């Protein structure tokens, strides 16, 4: 599939002279990609039907079984090879509403392996880490977060990619935005260091201080796309919220407007489950003792 995509783009953009290829194998690959590509159908089945494929989830197992069945339908031997165990977990419903200072439904989802809220959810004020001068300042502030949601990510001044700014903004506007963003990032990491924690362990401090949940937003610097990794909490939910919604919560909290959100986040623990690699094999004829290995991440 990877070769098919690559050659298909080559066929589309190169001139006829540049595409003159005599090798029959390469010509066959180009013809297959150009005239018989199944990439869109396969992507639909895997992305739209199966969906996200976190290791240890039923969806990951569904994807493995789908791949084996698909290979078999092509006459290719395939099987799932168990290589270990993993934490079994499944994301359920995530619903987030801002209820103060106005009503607005927010776009977000649970981080991987996030604990659940109670069935009816939790409603609480949203706060953020203030600018501090010492670890003592931070420890004193921790005493104020009991029963609240905490914003744990850096605020982003824009949701547009740099390439979009470069194309549409004035050069001086683009340069100012980059400088402002770099300064915000410098101050954020400096403030984090003053807490005495790192980004891997600070969430535990929030949880131990009585926060009811954490709200994060890890922007990928591509319009509309966040990176969603794993929660680092044991008992409280960690919710990822889209950049624009996170920015609104941040500005409200920063300006003393005390936003309130209601979060319903359900998930299911499935205990320890087996994990697999899906392996398919097309046996060679000319050199049966040699291997060409094509591999890729199947989890997502």
Show where each model-derived region lies.
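Structural recognition of the beta-strand scaffold that forms the well-ordered cores
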Residues: 42-45, 79-80, 126-128, 149-153, ...
